[in-house]
A protein has these predicted regions:
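Conserved SAM-binding loop of SAM-dependent methyltransferases across substrates and taxa
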Residues: 116-127
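S-adenosyl-L-methionine
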Residues: 11-103, 140-180
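Conserved short alpha-helix immediately C-terminal to the canonical SAM/SAH-binding motif I
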Residues: 117, 138-139
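C-terminal substrate-binding/active-site "lid" region of AdoMet-derived donor-dependent transferases
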Residues: 193-251
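A short SAM/SAH-binding and catalytic strip from SAM-dependent methyltransferases
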Residues: 181-196
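Conserved SAM-binding motif I beta-strand of class I
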Residues: 129-134
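Conserved class I S-adenosyl-L-methionine
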Residues: 103-113
Length: 252
């Protein structure tokens, strides 16, 4: 989408409204975002200008490695979700689908890139374990480096009680090989995954316990092992995408 200039002018206010202000274009306050000011600030410490990161940092790293190694599969195309959007998604999972009612649980990101959903999840809920699986080594290395920034800049703010029992695991591996069967919530930015890969992921996902929530973008898990419980539109790094929320059910 490109920006365009408008030549339209605003008429001066009519008599009797000289003191009125134009507020129609101002977005209303978002109560959720207002309550997450600290988390937004901490996320920016991990992925913002303080580390020299641009909004396209992960995409640039991914593109450079794929070009260097000669990887041509479109399933490796990079995409990520914004923190504010991810926070809204996690709030929906908690409010509508029974997730994260108590501390604990395991969060897994399939194809985690530079780790934004991983550390976003850690800021939003006290998980027992957070697992990121990423096959591109350079992206995986950023996750490991970000863990150092988490320890140095985020843990002291959140406090020992909030973070001491939280374990992080970063796997530089193929997510069809790695074990993620203990997940309570699985997230995957699957917009660029092809149907064959989604079929394989769905087969792999049968190892998940019934009740496990699986969140995907654009493409959803296939087969009777997963029930669709909600479909919505959310903002991704490249624009709006369909988000599917599914639950693992006992039938296979």
């Amino acid at each position: 989408m490109s920006d365009s200039d408008s030549d339209a002018s605003i008429e001066p206010p009519t008599q009797g409204f000289a003191d009125s202000t134009l507020t129609a274009t101002e977005p209303p306050p978002n109560p959720l975002m207002e309550s997450l000011k600290q988390e937004i600030d901490l996320f920016d410490k991990l992925y913002g200008k303080q580390r020299g990161f641009s909004e396209t940092h992960g995409k640039e790293i991914s593109r450079a490695e794929r070009k260097r190694e000669g990887y041509i599969s479109t399933t490796l195309t990079y995409g990520e979700i914004k923190f504010e959007t991810f926070a809204e998604l996690m709030n929906i999972l908690k409010g509508r689908h029974g997730a994260m009612k108590e501390d604990g649980g395991v969060f897994v990101d399939i194809g985690c890139g530079i780790g934004k959903p991983l550390f976003g999840a850690a800021l939003l809920h006290k998980f027992d374990k957070i697992v990121g699986i990423e096959i591109l080594e350079d992206l995986y290395k950023v996750c490991v480096e970000t863990m150092q920034h988490w320890t140095r800049h985020v843990k002291p703010v959140l406090g020992e009680e909030r973070t001491q029992d939280m374990q992080f695991s970063f796997l530089n591996n193929d997510f069809l090989i790695a074990d993620w069967s203990d997940a309570d919530i699985v997230f995957m930015n699957s917009t660029c995954f092809n149907r064959s890969l989604m079929i394989d992921l769905s087969a792999k996902g049968k190892a998940l316990a019934p009740g496990t929530i699986v969140v995907t973008t654009t493409k959803r898990m296939v087969g009777p092992a997963f029930d669709l419980v909600e479909e919505l539109q959310m903002e991704e790094s490249w624009g709006d995408a369909t988000v599917y929320i599914q639950k693992r059910v006992e039938r296979s």
